[in-house]
Structures are given as structure tokens and as C-alpha cells.
């Protein structure tokens, strides 16, 4: 059974919290499907080319149909002409969204949480609050844990803590309601307040 290390104010391990046993039974394919859907949902969809109806000009037939000895042409804007349109190019009206069921989203989160805990990269603390709002105080938390980057999960976000972590490229702060499987899996470590962790587990 996966156990979460509970840390004190000095970030020393004091106790452990067990995740529900069912988390260990979740198939990894649920995480794959959710991450695939999440990334598709945030895709920029900016690639766009002009078709024959979008390119200006080319309305006049460039030369007569017969008698020149050359190939016939009806427009100078077909895809075989320089300055012409693109055939079968990408359009920015495409919808890349992929549906994932609510149950599957939950299973993906459970797998991601269990994976972090199993690898000793999930930590629980009573409170994460940077009252000074200073980045150096926020950075010291990450340095004490000795991790490359971290997802910080608070039960309720406060302005000072958000300000302190905002300038750190290797940290991301969210409240418990915003947690998803992608964020948990993409960061090398997760630090959560006990109340936030209870809220996440309770939702399942």
C-alpha cells in the first residue's frame, strides 16, 4: 500500500498517510488517455493555409483553352502555380478535442497520485504559506526537498503564497479543485497541504 510522507515545518518526516488501496489497482492506460485528451485540448490550432477560394486573383483564364500547344489552365491560383493555393493544407477551424469520461478522468488522477507516492515524490504538510510573499522563501522549500520541480497543492490559494511561487519556473501552485492527472504526472514532485489531500481523496 502506498504511503505519503508527512513533513513538519523543517521538512522532516514525522508520519505517514495511506492512500486508498484501490488506487494501486488502476490501469496506466487511463492516464495515457487523459494526458492525450488534455494536450489535444490546449493545442493552439494556429496552422492555416489558403485554398483556391481564399487566394486573391486568378479569376481570369490565363490563356485560351486550345491552339497554344501548352497545357490548359483555368486559373493562376491552383496549387501547381507559384503564388497559388495549397492543396489539402491545414485549416484553423479543426477541433482537436478528445472526449474522456468523468470516471476515466478520476481513474487517471488516482493512478498519477499513486505513482508519485510509490516513487516517494509526494509530500504532505500542514500548511504551505509564504506570508512574506518573497520568491527566495518559496525557493527554499524546493531546495530543502531536493527536487527538480514541484506542483504545490493548497486547500485555498492566498495572494502572498501565489506571488512568492509565481516567479519560479520550476513550480506551479494550484488549489485542490484544480488538480488533474496531467499536472500531477508532469512535475517530478508534489507537495500538498493535508486538507487539500483529504479533499482530493474524498472526491473519489
Curated annotation (Swiss-Prot):
One MF annotation (Gene Ontology) recorded for this entry: structural constituent of ribosome
Gene3D superfamilies: 3.40.1370.10
Alphabetized InterPro entries for the sequence: Ribosomal_uL4, Ribosomal_uL4-like, Ribosomal_uL4_dom_sf
Secretion signal span: none
One Gene Ontology term from the biological process aspect of the record: translation
Keyword field contains Ribonucleoprotein: yes
Region of interest called Disordered, as start-end residue ranges on this chain: 48-75
Cited SUPFAM superfamilies: Ribosomal protein L4 (SSF52166)
Keyword RNA-binding: yes
Pfam families named in the record: Ribosomal_L4
Keyword set, alphabetical order: Ribonucleoprotein, Ribosomal protein, RNA-binding, rRNA-binding
Cellular component annotations (GO), alphabetically ordered: ribonucleoprotein complex; ribosome
UniProt xrefs under NCBIfam families: rplD_bact (TIGR03953)
Similarity remark: Belongs to the universal ribosomal protein uL4 family.
Quaternary structure and interacting proteins, as annotated: Part of the 50S ribosomal subunit.
Task of the protein: One of the primary rRNA binding proteins, this protein initially binds near the 5'-end of the 23S rRNA. It is important during the early stages of 50S assembly. It makes multiple contacts with different domains of the 23S rRNA in the assembled 50S subunit and ribosome. Forms part of the polypeptide exit tunnel.
Listed PANTHER family: 50S RIBOSOMAL PROTEIN L4 (PTHR10746), LARGE RIBOSOMAL SUBUNIT PROTEIN UL4M (PTHR10746:SF6)
Protein name listed in UniProt: Large ribosomal subunit protein uL4
Natural source organism: Campylobacter fetus subsp. fetus (strain 82-40)
Amino acid at each position: 500500500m502506498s504511503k505519503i510522507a508527512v513533513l513538519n515545518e523543517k521538512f522532516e518526516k514525522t508520519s505517514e498517510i495511506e492512500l486508498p488501496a484501490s488506487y494501486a489497482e488502476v490501469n496506466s492506460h487511463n492516464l495515457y488517455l487523459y494526458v492525450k485528451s488534455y494536450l489535444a485540448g490546449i493545442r493552439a490550432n494556429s496552422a492555416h493555409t489558403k485554398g483556391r477560394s481564399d487566394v486573391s486573383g486568378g479569376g481570369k483564364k490565363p490563356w485560351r483553352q486550345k491552339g497554344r500547344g501548352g497545357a490548359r489552365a483555368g486559373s493562376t491560383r491552383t496549387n501547381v502555380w507559384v503564388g497559388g493555393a495549397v492543396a489539402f493544407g491545414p485549416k484553423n477551424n479543426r477541433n482537436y478535442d478528445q472526449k474522456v469520461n468523468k470516471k476515466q478522468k478520476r481513474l487517471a488522477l488516482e493512478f498519477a497520485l499513486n505513482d508519485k507516492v510509490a516513487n516517494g515524490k509526494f509530500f504532505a504538510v500542514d500548511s504551505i504559506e509564504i506570508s512574506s510573499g518573497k520568491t527566495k522563501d518559496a525557493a527554499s522549500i524546493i531546495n530543502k526537498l531536493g527536487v527538480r520541480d514541484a506542483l504545490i497543492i493548497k486547500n485555498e490559494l492566498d495572494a502572498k503564497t501565489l506571488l512568492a511561487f509565481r516567479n519560479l519556473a520550476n513550480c506551479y501552485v494550484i488549489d485542490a479543485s484544480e488538480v488533474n492527472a496531467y499536472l500531477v504526472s508532469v512535475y517530478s514532485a508534489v507537495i500538498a497541504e493535508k486538507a487539500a489531500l483529504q479533499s482530493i481523496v474524498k472526491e473519489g
